């Protein structure tokens, strides 16, 4: 079996080496971050040296060692997603969809003319719908007498790959669609995968990026138990210092980012910026 695997890998490498690989360009951006709810706002606040770290507002941190994080602020979900639909989505999926909506709008390709069979979605996420998991399990633990009554959207809201699926369904994209989950490298791996899909000629456009929303009791409590989070509660803005001898852990954040990756000739043919 190892020899057979080597043979297939070797054959694939020869095949790739003889292919004319496509060039890939970025034609659209989307971002929802603790520094801003658009790419422009995020960039300007970054240039101004602002920090997104502040006391946590998502839940009561009285009993937690870490009481601050980088939350997305002042975001009206319903500016992008219908209120009824938003209730069916975990926060991480909401953020992912908003970043994708911004990216698709920025790329400005004609949704009526583009070949949707060659437009894909590949997103990365480290954890997924942890807040949904927390809410459902907490309710069952607090009310066992009611029996196992779970929301029918529990699993669809929680699973890690739902964001890429929701984005595809929103636009009717039928190209490559999957999620990469590799902890802090998830989004980088998603972009690398999207890049390769286009390079190999399997898609013309990939909506790619990453999202996470784990600022909840389970998320913060779990990382606190690992002694992984900073507890510099008196100075949140300067707590993230990975290269300092006085570092004491990372600072949790939430948000989403999107790059519209596109095959060069396809982008030029439609007059992309």
Set out the residue ranges of the language-model regions.
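ACP-dependent fatty acid/polyketide chain-elongation machinery
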Residues: 17-85, 107, 265-273
């Amino acid at each position: 079996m190892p020899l057979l695997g080597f043979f297939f890998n070797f054959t694939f490498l020869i095949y790739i080496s003889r292919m004319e690989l496509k060039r890939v360009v970025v034609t659209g951006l989307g971002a929802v971050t603790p520094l801003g709810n658009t790419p422009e706002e995020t960039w300007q606040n970054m240039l101004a040296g602002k920090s997104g770290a502040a006391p946590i507002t998502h839940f009561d941190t009285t009993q937690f060692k870490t009481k601050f994080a980088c939350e997305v602020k002042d975001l009206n979900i319903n500016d992008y997603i219908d209120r009824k639909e938003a209730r069916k989505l975990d926060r991480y999926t909401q953020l992912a969809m908003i970043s994708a909506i911004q990216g698709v709008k920025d790329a400005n390709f004609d949704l009526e003319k583009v070949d949707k069979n060659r437009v894909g979605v590949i997103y990365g996420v480290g954890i997924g719908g942890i807040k949904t998991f927390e809410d459902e399990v907490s309710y069952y633990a607090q009310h066992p007498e009611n029996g196992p009554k779970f929301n029918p959207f529990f699993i669809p809201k929680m699973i890690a790959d739902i964001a890429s699926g929701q984005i595809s369904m929103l636009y009717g994209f039928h190209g490559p669609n999957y999620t990469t989950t590799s902890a802090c490298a998830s989004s980088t791996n998603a972009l690398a995968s999207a890049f390769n899909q286009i390079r190999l000629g399997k898609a013309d456009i990939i909506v790619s990026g990453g999202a996470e929303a784990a600022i909840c009791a389970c998320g913060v409590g779990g990382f606190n138990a690992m002694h992984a989070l900073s507890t510099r509660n008196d100075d949140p803005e300067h707590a993230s210092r990975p290269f300092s001898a006085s570092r004491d852990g990372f600072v949790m954040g939430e948000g989403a980012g999107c790059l519209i990756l596109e095959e060069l000739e396809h982008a030029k043919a439609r007059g992309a910026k």
